[in-house]
Amino acid sequence: MLAKRIIPCLDTIGRNVVKGTSFVNIRIVGDAKELARRYEREGADEIVLLDITASEEGRGTFVDVVTEVASELFVPLTVGGGIKNIEDVRKLLKAGADKVSINTAAVENPDIINQIASEFGSQCLVVAIDVKKRGKKSWEVYVKGGKVPTGIDFKDWIVEVEKRGAGEILLTSIDADGHLSGYDYELLECALNYSNLPLIASGGAGSLEDLYKALKIGVDAVLAASIFHFGTYTIPEVKKYLKEKGIWVRLD
């Protein structure tokens, strides 16, 4: 059994790390390189770095920012935002990313999942899925930074991305994001029932108990932003709590 992972998320606009609520009301919280280094020192298992406006604005990837952040980072780095094709993936991996995360590109051209998995291996491909609840045990997939509904049912999509060769799922509840009231646990349970891929829970972590509940359900990693950016908890505090609750985490 692998140790559960604690992953700080750095949503960026340029070199600035930002945080909002349900993907809006964005404010700057720090510098990407400085925060990545700080979280690594604290014991983060991975870092996720996302350019949150690239797809919405039709921009390319932020290779220069990735190069800067990766240059002094030794934990795995997952990078996403603005990826449109295999060449974008190649540039980001060359810049120092260990994994790439695709969302909008995967929905607009599902074949890109197969292409990336074939060219670089499933182990470096994370498919990010942003959803909003639309009924009882029903969620709709959104793209373009959570702004555009697709009409695609989440359950159908998670099954398809696994079949096409994704290596991991980063699942975000837009409804819960930034509200600090807990993950959408019903959504996480649904994902685990429909897919065998490693699952990263995202959107809504506000307490140590929130993290524990998600990991207890069976997710492989918890992603959080606000609780780390605003100093609610440190990564050592999170890991100490989880260890005491019987969750296997890596301690430095």
Swiss-Prot record:
Q: Report the pathway entry.
A: Amino-acid biosynthesis; L-histidine biosynthesis; L-histidine from 5-phospho-alpha-D-ribose 1-diphosphate: step 5/9
Q: List the InterPro entries hit by this protein, alphabetically.
A: Aldolase_TIM (IPR013785), His_biosynth (IPR006062), HisF (IPR004651), IGPS_HisA/HisF (IPR050064), RibuloseP-bd_barrel (IPR011060)
Entry annotated with the keyword Transmembrane helix: no
Q: Which UniProt keywords apply?
A: Amino-acid biosynthesis, Cytoplasm, Histidine biosynthesis, Lyase
One Pfam family linked to the record: His_biosynth
GO CC annotations on file: cytoplasm
A single GO molecular-function term is: lyase activity
GO BP annotations, alphabetical order: L-histidine biosynthetic process
Enzyme active site: D11, D130
Is Cytoplasm included in the keywords of this UniProt record?
A: yes
Q: What is its EC number?
A: 4.3.2.10
Source superkingdom: Bacteria
Which residues does UniProt call coiled coil?
none
Q: Where in the cell is it found?
A: Cytoplasm
State the reactions this protein catalyses.
Answer: 5-[(5-phospho-1-deoxy-D-ribulos-1-ylimino)methylamino]-1-(5-phospho-beta-D-ribosyl)imidazole-4-carboxamide + L-glutamine = D-erythro-1-(imidazol-4-yl)glycerol 3-phosphate + 5-amino-1-(5-phospho-beta-D-ribosyl)imidazole-4-carboxamide + L-glutamate + H(+)
What does the annotation say about its assembly with partners?
Heterodimer of HisH and HisF.
Q: Which family does it belong to?
A: Belongs to the HisA/HisF family.
Entry function = IGPS catalyzes the conversion of PRFAR and glutamine to IGP, AICAR and glutamate. The HisF subunit catalyzes the cyclization activity that produces IGP and AICAR from PRFAR using the ammonia provided by the HisH subunit.
Q: Which HAMAP family match?
A: HisF (MF_01013)
Record protein name field? Imidazole glycerol phosphate synthase subunit HisF
Its taxonomic placement starts with: Bacteria, Pseudomonadati, Dictyoglomota, Dictyoglomia, Dictyoglomales
Q: Which gene encodes it?
A: hisF
